[in-house]
């Protein structure tokens, strides 16, 4: 008889232990009773009726999913390899359990197919230069598709765009040609500005003989300041005329 009570006590203890569930702060427990959805509970300590009830625990923290590299043909027929990262979390645990068999796998597959679709509709220049725009588009589409599953997609970011080797060489040549073009434009603008300054100076000097002579004498003074230098400079006729006119006056 004593063994009977001991066995009964053990059964009761095991029954109580199997009925206790602890749900963490970042989790929710989706409870089913006789196969019917009761609702999501948590966080805290809960008791369920063994055999009649069961609970599925769902993590509410943000999940980071790395989309594997996808080989895609862009709208302008360029083959590229693209990968991305998707950030999502469960906002409705009951839907995440009842509306889809495996919400994590389903979200991952949807992210891959959507990435291929969006990149395939864009041209290469758009993929390379308008990545933020494509990120927003991807986020909106995936979020809309996963909403019935109780999933919220917070962000999608395209990480790497790998181009074929031949395309990389062509783009490098184009970049070099663009740099050379800009360099030529800058040099041409500099030469144009210098020519304009010289023209302005020539106009000023042409309006005054004294200015021409003054500039000539200034040049002679600068040259004569150099040591160990013998310079033979012709005397301009204008300079002789200037001194003759000064002497007569």
UniProtKB/Swiss-Prot annotation:
**Where found?**
Membrane
Q: Which SMART domains match?
A: PHB
Q: What is its main location?
A: membrane
| A Pfam cross-reference name | Band_7
Alphabetic keyword roster: Membrane, Transmembrane, Transmembrane helix
Q: Does the keyword Lipoprotein apply?
A: no
What are the cysteine partners in each disulfide bond? none
Query: How does this protein sit in the membrane?
Result: Single-pass membrane protein
Q: Does the keyword Membrane apply?
A: yes
Where does the sequence pass through the membrane? 3-23
SUPFAM superfamilies hit by this protein? Band 7/SPFH domain
Q: Kindly list the GO CC terms recorded for this protein.
A: plasma membrane
Q: Which family does it belong to?
A: Belongs to the band 7/mec-2 family.
Name this protein carries in UniProt: Uncharacterized protein AF_1420
This protein's species is Archaeoglobus fulgidus (strain ATCC 49558 / DSM 4304 / JCM 9628 / NBRC 100126 / VC-16)
């Amino acid at each position: 008889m004593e063994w009977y009570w001991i066995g009964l006590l053990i059964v009761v203890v095991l029954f109580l232990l199997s009925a206790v569930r602890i749900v963490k702060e970042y989790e929710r427990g989706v409870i089913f009773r006789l196969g019917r959805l009761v609702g999501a509970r948590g966080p805290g300590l809960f008791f369920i009726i063994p055999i009649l009830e069961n609970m599925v625990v769902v993590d509410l923290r943000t999940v980071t999913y790395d989309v594997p590299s996808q080989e895609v043909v862009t709208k302008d027929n360029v083959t590229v390899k693209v990968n991305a990262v998707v950030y999502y979390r469960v906002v409705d645990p009951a839907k995440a359990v009842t509306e889809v068999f495996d919400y994590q796998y389903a979200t991952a597959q949807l992210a891959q197919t959507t990435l291929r679709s969006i990149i395939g509709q864009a041209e290469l220049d758009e993929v390379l230069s308008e990545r933020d725009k494509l990120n927003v588009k991807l986020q909106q589409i995936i979020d809309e598709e996963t909403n019935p599953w109780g999933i919220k997609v917070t962000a999608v970011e395209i990480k790497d765009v790998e181009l074929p080797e031949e395309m990389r060489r062509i783009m490098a040549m184009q970049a070099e040609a663009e740099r050379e073009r800009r360099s030529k434009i800058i040099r041409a603008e500099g030469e144009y500005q210098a020519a304009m300054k010289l023209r302005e100076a020539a106009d000023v000097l042409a309006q005054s003989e004294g200015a021409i002579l003054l500039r000539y004498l200034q040049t002679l003074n600068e040259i004569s300041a150099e040591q160990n230098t013998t310079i033979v400079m012709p005397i301009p006729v204008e300079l002789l005329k200037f001194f003759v006119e000064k002497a007569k006056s």
